[in-house]
Amino acid sequence: LKSVLGYVDTKNYTYGQLFNETNARTGGIQCGIDVFDKANDPEAFRTMFTIRGKALYSQMDFLFQMMEEILNTSKLSDTRRLGEIIGEIRSRGQASLIGAGHQTAVLRSAAYGSPMAEYQDEMAGVGYYKFIEDLEKNFQEKKDEIVAGLQNAMAEIIRKDSFMVSYTGERESVEQVKTLSGALKK
């Protein structure tokens, strides 16, 4: 899901339009997963799906409008586009694993002794690469399952009752951010 949102068509934009508009008027919008350990329990951790964006104050309305568009209207059922995205992720992942082999090895070895590192490996390391490689190899057989999985993940992850906004900027804009972020909770 983190690798798909922002890279598929939405209700009002094709992927290309979304990409061009977002990058022309903001510093970008990225989805990801953050992992936080619990200080009093080295085996426990918490994960959060994140959507991050940067914009000048004059483009703040647009930034939140585009975040809302991505979160609420992304077309996750376009299997042709999903196949392209999976291929791109596999290619970039392969280059990343090779180019940063030392980091890959550290994460993979840590995954054997730490539940948090194991999760991180599954989300961004060798485990993730193997998952993506399997999806690409068996895409035709799994495409309906992939779409259903993405749609279920959206329903489970993007929820009003577990929504948090983190803002860095001028104090004068806090109220504007509170108002704009309300639309993301739909």
Specify the residue positions occupied by each region the protein language model found.
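M16 family metallopeptidases and their MPP-like homologs
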Residues: 1-73, 79-140, 160-169
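Generic solvent-exposed, charged/amphipathic alpha-helical segments
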Residues: 2, 19, 68, 151, ...
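Structured alpha-helical segments in the cores of large, soluble enzyme domains
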Residues: 142-154
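Residue-level signal for alpha-helix termini/capping positions
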Residues: 155-159
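An aromatic/glycine/proline-enriched structural segment found at the starts
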Residues: 166-186
